[in-house]
Amino acid sequence: MLNFSEQCLDMAQSILSRNIGAINDDGSISPLENELSLACEPGHAAMALGEFYRATGSTSLEGKDIVDLVSKCIMAQSNDAEYTEDGLAYLSLGLLAFGPSKDRNAVWDKLSEDTRKNLEKRLLSRTDYTDFFQVFNIAKAVARFSMGLSKKDETGKLIDRFLERIQQTSTGNYFDDKAESEDVIDGAFDIFGVVAFVFIRQSLQLHANMHLRDRKIPSLRTFAEKYLRLLPDVVRSDGLGWSYGRRIGAYGQMHCISMILQAMRDNWIAEDKMPEYMDVLRRLFQFFFMTYLDQENGYLVIRDEQRSAENSCTTRMANFDAARYLCQWARLAKTIGRNMNSEAIAEKNISKYVSFDNSGRKEQGVFIYKNAETAMHTCLPLVAPNASNTSSSLAFPHIPGIFDWPADKYLPILIPELTFGEHVTTPSYYGKRCTTGMGFRNSFFFRYEQPELINKDGKIIKGLGSCKVSWSFSGKKLVGDFIYSVQNQVTLDNFRLVVAIGAPHAEYHVPMTYALGQNGQGVSIEKDDFQANWLDTEVVSEDPEYRSYWGKIHYLQVYARDKAMVMRPGVQYRITIALEPDIAFAE
């Protein structure tokens, strides 16, 4: 993997060279045109530069002093105006990259007395979190103890608490990054679970006490391996990684690559499974390299005239994160030292439901279907949206390039949306009685019920109605059947279902990435008790709101009812949609 290591380091150096000029004298980060900086960006920059130092041992880049740049970032991130928990956690690990203690840390020596006091005050503040922010507490605890700011090491206790809460909130022992609001349903089982374990493992690697690291790795492995085992089933043949939930796109590649490399370094992968994971790693990296890296100019692109990302992620931050990960991959690859040129593993058929939670209150998970003969490969998530009101967590078959959705906008893609007054409902986010099995003619099915309808923001609406959902999968044909009932007579104000027609990025894509063939998505409505109609096709090619993480959405086909309808108790209302897409490839 030495060539891979060198390639990663070259890319990291190129990305940093293009972005360190954005670090101002006061440590703030200048945004790209048409973007706004985030308060946590100095921390992300500090960690990227710290990882570059760990990978190369060099304290200069493009004639600039890295130690000086990191000290400026710390000054900005630790003051009152720019302080954020995530930014502080990233800069903590960036600081530790230059030395495990105050006495042997060039960046600490460079900090002014005021900045040291601010940093100490921030690191010593303790707040207990029940969501993803708890991993930032772990990073702060590592820095507190390693830098001698606290004689008591709380790292182990915080890791134990993090793992205990996973067991309390998930019967499947997956991480739930639940929303702060009590009104929103919990169960945000998305890529933040992968990120959490990658970040904790990274923090432990920088801990001054290697014995603590050795004690905690086995318990981390118990939970992290669940995600590791998911990756071969989730990653598509063209290398596309995690494709549902928040913060995907480029991050959906980077986080998965990091988890696999960490697992290889720690010997978590059995020898007989190594060829499979090497193949997954190769595909993930190739997709990342060809889809998101501008190889001519040497930087990461997450937004342009054809694609987009969530507003919570800026291009500048993504570039620093990419540089950080590339430096880590370079180091890990050197440590692993294996040959990465493994043969491609034959694709196998998959039909499985992975249960994240099966409590008395709700059931959540993801249904994965792959048919090697037809190239159909989809994930159908049944997970909470956290506070993110977008399409990425909706319960439809996620197949970028075939069934697309906008990166940062809500649309009821391939599933019905029923509006009752102020309540806009979706058959997503949770279910009860989730079942899967084999149906007629070797088809597979995934079924669930919603005893209470839920709105698009993730709030359950008591006493309105219920929904039964059944998806069947056979070859490349998918059929979704939705049956609605109401408890009392109610007026349905609006009904719609949206089909988005998109394409991969015209320039940045792997040759075998999925794209629609001449026959399109093969959409048909087989049953409709709502008496809706297809509206005129909307052309959205030039609208920046309708860009996915991977390419542009060109058209929207909306199936809607344009007038009110009275729904009565005791009557079932069914809508059945069939999909038989023509799966082709970009080249």
What residue ranges belong to the model's regions?
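Alpha-solenoid repeat junctions
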Residues: 46-54, 92-100, 142-146, 201-205, ...
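Extended polysaccharide-engagement surfaces of secreted carbohydrate-active enzymes
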Residues: 237, 253-536
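Alpha-helical solenoid scaffolds in eukaryotic proteins
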Residues: 7-18, 24-31, 65-76, 113-122, ...
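Extracellular polysaccharide-recognition and catalytic grooves
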Residues: 120-350
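Beta-strand-rich recognition/accessory modules
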Residues: 531-587
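Low-complexity, Ser/Thr/Pro/Gly-enriched N-terminal "stalk/linker" regions
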Residues: 1-66
